[in-house]
C-alpha cells in the first residue's frame, strides 16, 4: 500500500526548471509525422512534441502546419527552461522540415546552426518497392 502512495507522489512531482541557455533541437521529419526534441548540449531532453500529440491525426499529421504547431509547443516549454540559443539538426525527408525551423525562429529563439543529419546509406538495405498509384 505504501508503494502505491509513493508512485503517486513521484508522478505528481513538479518538473524541475533547468536553467540552460544553449541547446539542440532535433527535428525528425518523416512522411507520416514530425517529432521535435529539444535537448541540452549533453543530449538530456528538455522538451519534446509531435504532430500527432498536438491533436493532428491521420494524414494531417504529415503537414507543414502540424510540424509548426509541434515546434511551437516544444519551443515554449524549452524557453521556460531558459533556452535562448539553439542548434537545429534535421533528420528525414518529410514535409515538416522547414516549417519547424521557422516556428522555432519566430518564437524568438536564436538559431545558430542548421544541420542536416539525414542518414544516407552507402548502398545498404534494399529500399521498399515503388508505389503504383
From Swiss-Prot:
Keyword rRNA-binding: yes
GO biological process: translation
A GO term, aspect molecular function: structural constituent of ribosome
Parts forming coiled coils: none
UniProt keywords, alphabetically: Ribonucleoprotein, Ribosomal protein, RNA-binding, rRNA-binding
Keyword Transferase in record: no
Subunit structure: Part of the 30S ribosomal subunit. Interacts with proteins S7 and S18. Binds to IF-3.
NCBIfam families per UniProt: PRK05309.1, uS11_bact
Cited function: Located on the platform of the 30S subunit, it bridges several disparate RNA helices of the 16S rRNA. Forms part of the Shine-Dalgarno cleft in the 70S ribosome.
The protein's name: Small ribosomal subunit protein uS11
Naturally occurring in which organism (per UniProt): Ralstonia pickettii (strain 12J)
